[in-house]
């Protein structure tokens, strides 16, 4: 591994990366101060999730149910949405108002992307090469598109782990723990990006094994390398069992397939294709972005070839073998998968359709571009101090272009239900289609602030507690009562301390028969076997990874 800068002297300090990262973040904060926060498509969803999670965590309850969604009827959002992004958002929400919490989230995610790419490329590249690669990766057009226009905060945070996974896979001596940890972090941050990362792992593993076979490596060595990739994948997935197992078991209890309706499937979002359900603006922006990426990659690879041909004598390569070929093949594959002829691949590869939008593959193309830039800058001699200034300037130029293209004007806050006067107290009312409980219908769903009964009450209904929900009814006679809460298999509903039979409703709300007396109804969340087994598997896997790391360190 190359641990020298362009001048050839060892550099052990952190001055250059710290200065470059600080300059890039200050530039981003300056744009936020100048423009205000951006109204991304999913901003209300995330602000509502963060606010609900922060409230529950302050009460000592691990979030499972988003009570404010679906006009107060609720949905099991936190069962299915990976926890790392909303846990970070909840922390930021307790420290700042909603708009500023979103700004800090974007800055922290950008810093994570910067640090991850710097670390991944610095293992073999010079300091200037790693600085430029990190700045381009963190402020690339697709990153700004995701953060400013889409407010896809989970996807943005998950981009932090992709360079770590890729670096572990292309390492000359990959380890199980180095593969397992970033893979697990991907699955705990964002499902579409985790699927991308899993296929990236599979692609690089096959590429590496094929290269070893072509070089006639011993069969035992090839088998050992395959075992490392397989073991890292298995342990990475098992490490997420506390989240992934309950989500898989409970998938039948919600309407996940509705996420792919109304133009949200891969067939409606290929490049160079427009359907009645496709957003023309998004298609135009993504196509332009793709053209810019392809042009930049071509220029970088041509420049690398020219520089290498002009060398007076062969120079030993410090980067992993066949990296340029791997990046070229990966870029071509990504480009193909964004075009309509690749529909058969999307249809038959397991879970690839969960990505919904083929242009999400631009996150991989961003990774390829950053690595290609590192390869290019690694071929030339640049002073680290000059590289710091160049990296900050590159970040500023990319952010300026991104702000002009993707920033959503805060003047449109009222249109999106985010007026400054009530943004701190706002709640997410609209239901999320894919998290709607099975059998429930969102059509005609209205706000219900309190329970309703078929007979009059002699006194107002009392709320005895919120977690668990306990209500006391004062009824004049036997009545059918409806709670402002949707039914879900994990709810245990008790009336007078006994399990209460429920009456089906079209909107899915809990409805039950109560006697003519003071009746206490309790609704409690029940932990299932999947939660217990999931936590046990995650803890056992964490212990296994610790033992792997200790064994590896002892032998080293």
Q: Positions of the model-derived regions?
A:
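Alpha-helical scaffolds flanking conserved acidic
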Residues: 133, 326, 446-449, 512
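Active-site-proximal, structured, solvent-exposed surfaces of multi-pass membrane proteins
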Residues: 449-555
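Membrane-interface segments at or immediately adjacent to transmembrane helices
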Residues: 408-470
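Intrinsically disordered, low-complexity regions
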Residues: 9, 14, 41, 322, ...
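Membrane-embedded transmembrane-helix bundle of lipid-linked glycan/lipid transferases
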Residues: 2-411, 522-526, 530-556
């Amino acid at each position: 591994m190359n641990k020298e800068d362009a001048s050839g002297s060892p550099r052990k300090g952190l001055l250059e990366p710290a200065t470059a990262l600080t300059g890039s973040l200050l530039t981003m904060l300056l744009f936020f101060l100048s423009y205000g926060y951006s109204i991304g498509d999913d901003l209300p969803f995330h602000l509502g999730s963060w606010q609900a999670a922060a409230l529950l965590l302050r009460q000592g309850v691990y979030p499972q149910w988003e009570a404010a969604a679906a006009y107060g009827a609720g949905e099991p959002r936190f069962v299915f949405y990976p926890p790392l992004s909303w846990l970070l958002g909840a922390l930021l929400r307790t420290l700042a108002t909603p708009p500023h919490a979103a700004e800090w989230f974007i800055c922290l995610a950008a810093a994570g992307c910067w640090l991850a790419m710097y670390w991944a490329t610095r293992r073999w590249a010079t300091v200037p090469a790693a600085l430029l690669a990190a700045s381009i990766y963190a402020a690339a057009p697709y990153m700004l598109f995701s953060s400013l226009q889409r407010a896809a905060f989970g996807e943005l945070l998950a981009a932090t782990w992709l360079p770590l996974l890729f670096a572990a896979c292309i390492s000359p001596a990959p380890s199980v723990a180095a593969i397992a940890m970033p893979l697990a972090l991907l699955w705990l941050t964002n499902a579409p990006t985790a699927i991308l990362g899993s296929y990236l792992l599979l692609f690089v593993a096959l590429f590496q094994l094929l290269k070893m076979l072509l070089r006639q490596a011993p069969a035992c060595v090839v088998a050992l390398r395959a075992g490392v990739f397989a073991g890292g994948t298995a342990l990475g997935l098992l490490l997420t069992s506390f989240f992934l197992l309950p989500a898989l078991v409970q998938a039948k209890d919600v309407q996940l397939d509705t996420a792919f309706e109304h133009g949200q499937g891969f067939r409606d979002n290929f490049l160079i294709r427009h359907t009645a359900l496709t957003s023309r603006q998004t298609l135009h922006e993504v196509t332009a972005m793709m053209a810019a990426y392809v042009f930049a990659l071509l220029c970088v690879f041509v420049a690398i070839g020219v520089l290498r041909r002009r060398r007076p004598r062969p120079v030993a390569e410090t980067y992993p073998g066949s990296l340029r070929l791997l990046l070229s093949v990966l870029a071509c594959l990504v480009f193909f998968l964004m075009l309509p002829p690749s529909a058969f691949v999307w249809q038959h590869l397991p879970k690839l359709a969960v990505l919904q939008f083929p242009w999400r593959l631009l996150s991989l193309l961003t990774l390829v571009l950053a690595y290609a830039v590192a390869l290019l800058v690694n071929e030339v001699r640049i002073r680290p101090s000059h590289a710091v200034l160049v990296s900050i300037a590159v970040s500023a130029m990319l952010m300026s272009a991104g702000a002009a293209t993707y920033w959503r004007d805060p003047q449109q806050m009222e249109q999106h239900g985010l007026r400054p006067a009530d943004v701190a107290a706002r709640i997410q009312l609209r239901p999320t289609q894919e998290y709607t409980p099975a059998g429930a219908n969102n059509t005609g769903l209205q706000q219900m602030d309190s329970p309703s009964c078929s007979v009059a009450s002699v006194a107002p209904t009392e709320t005895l507690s919120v977690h668990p929900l306990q209500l006391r009814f004062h009824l004049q006679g036997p009545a059918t009562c409806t709670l402002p809460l949707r039914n879900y298999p994990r709810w245990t509903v008790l009336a007078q301390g006994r399990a209460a039979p429920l009456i089906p409703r079209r909107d899915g709300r809990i409805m039950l028969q109560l006697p003519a007396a003071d009746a206490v109804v309790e609704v409690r969340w029940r932990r299932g076997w999947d939660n217990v087994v999931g936590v046990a598997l995650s803890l056992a896997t964490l212990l296994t990874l610790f033992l792997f790391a200790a064994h590896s360190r002892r032998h080293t």
